[in-house]
Every structure is written in structure tokens, then in C-alpha cells.
Amino acid sequence: MYNNLYILHKDNYYWTCIGNDSEYSKKYRLSLTDRYELGSGWVEIGMIPTNSEAEAKELQLKINTVFKPFIIVNSVILITMTQEFFLNCIKQIMNSDNNSMLAILDTITREYDYTKKYGDVYFIECKNNKYKIGCTTDFVRRWNSLKNEEQNQAIYMIDIFKSNDIYLDEARLQCACYNYKDNSNKVMKYIQEVGNSELYKKCIEVERIWKDYDKRCK
């Protein structure tokens, strides 16, 4: 059996993963279960068959291309949308070529709203070259509890990561998704070594904003 893209569901969480067969999918889901302590009871809400491993990886790359500009600190993307709209986006990505990527991205951009909650907040996390797409109602609760000026800070942070080429390579992706304790110094050191002073300044500002945000939410 060729690789498949699985869309998995557990409570309010959604993930995608590429698996060689159902047995691989079970193993991957087990690792997710262990990590997030969600217990058993996974439900596959969709399985997208592909004709080859290369095609599966290409589809995963397309998904990443569309959603990557929204990745921010702690793996949270502020896209509010309905589950139906989210799955429709995946379907569009499957049938798209590179020329239509920007159109899909533009559609998503118009769909999400920071102040009027009418869908879910989705996130993507990169781990060992596998990307999980998901949503969490806990972040919605936190977001809605923020004051307007605090939301504006977070919006400003999103604008940083949507600007120009800031999310084009893995180091910058890590900068957006890093764990403060484990990776921040390593990422900052890398950015300094490659001489990207503007990116370094932006990352410092993002770190300041989100450390403050985390304190307010705890």
C-alpha cells in the first residue's frame, strides 16, 4: 500500500500524518497519544489516498506551504474557521498546483477573524519532519480572555511572521515554534551566525511579547 495522508481526530484535536499503511498510522497515533496524554479512542475523520510516497510528500509540502505563514510561537496559528472550511482547504490543496497556492492562502486570510469567533483555532507543529495540523478550544478561551491591546500585540506578532521571507527556512520555522527552554538559545545563535540581524531583532521582540502573553494566561 502506498503512503496515505491521515486526518486524525481526538476530542477537539486534529492532526495529519503520512503513513505507509494502517499499522504505521497506529504507531504514529500511539506516539501522539503518549506525548499529549490524550488516551485511546482515535477516530480517523479522513484518509486521503496517494499513488506514491513522492505524491504523499508533495501533498504534505503543499499543506505546509499554505499554512506555514501563520505559524507563530508555541505552534499556534490564529486562523478561526469552521471544520468544514478547514477540510475544504485540504481538498483544495490536493487539487492545486503551485500557481493556485496564493489564491488558497488569500481565501484563508480573508476567512479568519481575530475578534469575532466563529470557528476553531488551528495550529501546526513540526516534529521530525512530520506536520500535525490541529485546533484547540483552550487557546480560544485564552484568546477571548485577552484585552484588546493584548490581542493587538499578538496580531503584531503574526504580522512579523507573515512579512516577506521570514518563514522560508527551517531555522525560521523553529524560531516561530521553538520551546523556550530547549531551543531558543540554539535558534538565536544560528540566526546570529548567519548574520541576519533584522530577523534576530524580530525574534527578540516576539519572545518578549509571548513571554508576557504566557504570564498573563497562566
PLM region descriptions:
Residues 1-218:
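Non-catalytic accessory segments flanking enzymatic or RNA/DNA-binding domains
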